Curated annotation (Swiss-Prot):
Keyword RNA-binding part of the UniProt annotation: yes
Gene name in the database record: rpsZ
Protein name: Small ribosomal subunit protein uS14
GO CC annotation terms, alphabetical: cytoplasm; small ribosomal subunit
Subunit comment: Part of the 30S ribosomal subunit. Contacts proteins S3 and S10.
């Protein structure tokens, strides 16, 4: 879990646009972020396995 101070710092508007970085809104993780789903890989996997993401299915071959 991310520190509250880091989540607040990321949410603030920066002086320069390039300094902005994405964080998962569910857990606050800054790495392994998927823009398409707006969350990190861990939360994405958890919600996909629960069936809460429409159109996402587990692949098997």
């Amino acid at each position: 879990m991310a520190k509250k101070s880091m989540m607040i710092k990321a949410a603030r508007s920066n002086k320069f646009k390039v300094r902005k970085y994405n964080r998962c809104p569910l857990c606050g993780r800054p790495r392994a972020y998927y823009r398409k789903f707006d969350m990190c890989r861990i939360c994405l996997r958890k919600l996909a396995l629960e069936g809460k993401l429409p159109g996402v299915i587990k692949s098997s071959w």
